[in-house]
Structure formats: structure tokens, C-alpha cells
From Swiss-Prot:
Protein name (database record): NADH-quinone oxidoreductase subunit K
Function: NDH-1 shuttles electrons from NADH, via FMN and iron-sulfur (Fe-S) centers, to quinones in the respiratory chain. The immediate electron acceptor for the enzyme in this species is believed to be ubiquinone. Couples the redox reaction to proton translocation (for every two electrons transferred, four hydrogen ions are translocated across the cytoplasmic membrane), and thus conserves the redox energy in a proton gradient.
Biological processes annotated in GO: ATP synthesis coupled electron transport
Ranges annotated as spanning the membrane: 6-26, 30-50, 63-83
Subunit structure: NDH-1 is composed of 14 different subunits. Subunits NuoA, H, J, K, L, M, N constitute the membrane sector of the complex.
Subcellular location, record wording: Cell inner membrane
Gene3D superfamilies registered for this protein in UniProt: 1.10.287.3510
InterPro entries registered for this protein in UniProt: NADH_UbQ_OxRdtase_chain4L/K, NUOK/Mnh_C1-like
Keyword flag NAD: yes
Alphabetized PANTHER family for the sequence: NADH-UBIQUINONE OXIDOREDUCTASE CHAIN 4L, NADH-UBIQUINONE OXIDOREDUCTASE SUBUNIT ND4L
Organism: Rhodopseudomonas palustris (strain BisB5)
Amino acid sequence: MTGSDLIAMMILAAGLFAIGLFGVLARRGIMFQLVALEVALSGPALGFVAAGAYHADPQGQGMFILVLTLAAAEVAVGLALFLRIRRIAGSDDSDVISGMKG
């Protein structure tokens, strides 16, 4: 991998992170926010793999596995919260959470 390939991959990773962050902040639906958060987490994961490939270091792949594991845990917790909030509030809008008591 050359230096220009690394720069292109890092720009792509930053773009994925920015798109995911925008999706989390712009959308009100909890499911859309979870999907956007997954997109945002794929950016740093791509950056770790690209940097590891550039430096011929397997730690980038190890960090990718760590990010992938954390993303899976985030989805599991997020879906459980989504189902609970939808059952209680009857809506998948994240603004409903601020109006809940207890």
C-alpha cells in the first residue's frame, strides 16, 4: 500500500464517520440512529485496517475486531432499548425519551 492509498482510505474513513455522525444528529428515529451509529463506527474500523496494512502491522486488524465487537454489543443493547421504549411509549421517536418519567 502506498502513501496515496493510505490517504484515500483515511479520507474515506473520515467520510464514513462524518456521514454516520450526521445521521445520528439529524434523524429522530431510534432505528435510523442505530444504523447511522454503525456507519460512524465503520469509519474508524476502516482507518485501523488501512493504517495496519500501510505499516504491515497486524494490530490494525486486531483493532478492527475490537471495534466490530463493540459495535455488535452496541447493536444488542440499542435494539433492546428500542424494543422497550417502543413498547412503553408506542413510538420510535427519540424525542419521546425526554418526555418519559421514572
